[in-house]
UniProtKB/Swiss-Prot annotation:
Gene3D superfamilies given in the database record: Mannose-Binding Protein A, subunit A
Function: Interferes with one step of hemostasis (modulation of platelet aggregation, or coagulation cascade, for example).
N-terminal signal peptide: 1-23
Disulphide bond pairs: 27-38, 55-144, 121-136
SMART domains per the UniProt record, alphabetical: CLECT (SM00034)
Domain C-type lectin residues, every copy: 34-145
Protein name listed in UniProt: Snaclec 3
Alphabetic keyword roster: Disulfide bond, Hemostasis impairing toxin, Secreted, Signal, Toxin
Assembly mode: Heterodimer; disulfide-linked.
Keyword Transferase: no
GO molecular function: toxin activity
Compartments (UniProt record): Secreted
Amino acid sequence: MGRFISVSFGLLVVFLSLSGTEAAFCCPSGWSAYDQNCYKVFTEEMNWADAEKFCTEQHKGSHLLSLHNIAEADFVLKKTLAMLKDGVIWMGLNDVWNECNWGWTDGAKLDYKAWNEGTNCFVFKIAKNHWSHMDCSSTHNFVCKFRV
C-alpha cells in the first residue's frame, strides 16, 4: 500500500511538472492564445463601431485588436493572412470619442506606434505589416482580443 501511494505521488509530481510547460491559461474554443491574451479572427465585414460592439459581445473584456509590440503583430499576421481576402483588419486604436487623443478601446496604454496621421480609425494592413488610417464607416474584417 505504501509503495502504491509513493508511486502515485511520484506520477502526480511528474504530471504537474510537465503540465507547467504548457500555456498556463486556456482560450475559449475558436480563439487563439498568445502572451496571456486570446484572439479571434472574424471574416465578416463591419464598420469600425459595429465591429467594436460585436467584439464586446463575444467575451467579457473583448475589444477590437490592440497591438503592443512587433512580436504580437507578427502573431496576428500569421493568424489572419491566409484567412482574409483583402488583408486589412480593424484595430481598436481610435480618437473617435476624444479628437487627437489616441487610445485603444480595451483601455491599454498606447506603447507601440506604426502609422502616419489621418482619420479617426485604424486598420492593420497585414501584408504590409503596418497600420493605416481609414474612414470609420468603411467595412473590413476584424480581430477581437481579450486579456486572460
